[in-house]
């Protein structure tokens, strides 16, 4: 993943934002900004952050990579993570998804700029880096869906 944090386009986006007083407010503003910069395009392969910005659209990995880039350019450690999350789309199901973790106040906080979530909902299930990478590759060659076969409650 190439993070163009020094890109003129990224710097312009950050300069156009109000300057939040705390890391928590900055994270919320960055989630909203990343969400507003792109329109979701379901079947578009993930590309570079700058390509997604130029097109004005992207899929979840593009939203997540844009957030990672903006956060790092603003001085916050951030990373893109992969897993599964429940989508209420045309065919509600758990699907492959990308979102972010950002370090604030000594703790990693999950955020989802695709769905404009400053706090992740309970359906985000992070996968290991190896499994996440394998699912990312598989999602480009075929549709990846998970089906709940059984559920139980405490």
Q: What is each stretch, according to the model?
A:
Residues 1-57:
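Acidic low-complexity segments
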Residues 153-154:
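Short, solvent-exposed mixed-charge patches
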Residues 65-149:
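Hydrophobic/aromatic-rich core segments of domains that either
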Residues 31-37, 50-82:
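Structured core of small recognition/catalytic domains
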Residues 6-8, 15, 59, 101, ...:
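Glutamate identity and glutamate-enriched acidic tracts
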Residues 7, 27, 60-65, 97:
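Short alpha-helical patches at coil-to-helix transitions and adjacent helical residues
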């Amino acid at each position: 993943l190439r993070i163009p944090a020094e890109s003129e386009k990224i710097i312009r986006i950050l300069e156009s934002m109000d300057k939040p007083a705390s890391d928590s407010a900055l994270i919320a503003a960055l989630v909203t900004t990343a969400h507003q910069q792109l329109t979701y395009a379901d079947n578009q392969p993930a590309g570079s952050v700058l390509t997604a910005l130029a097109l004005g659209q992207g899929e979840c990995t593009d939203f997540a990579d844009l957030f990672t880039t903006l956060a790092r350019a603003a001085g916050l450690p951030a990373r893109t993570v992969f897993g599964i999350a429940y989508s209420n789309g045309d065919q509600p199901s758990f699907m492959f998804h990308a979102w972010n973790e950002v370090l604030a106040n000594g703790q990693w906080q999950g955020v989802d700029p695709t769905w404009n979530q400053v706090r992740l909902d309970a359906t985000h299930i992070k996968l290991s880096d190896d499994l996440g990478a394998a699912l990312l590759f598989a999602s480009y060659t075929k549709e990846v869906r998970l089906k709940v076969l059984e559920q139980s409650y405490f």
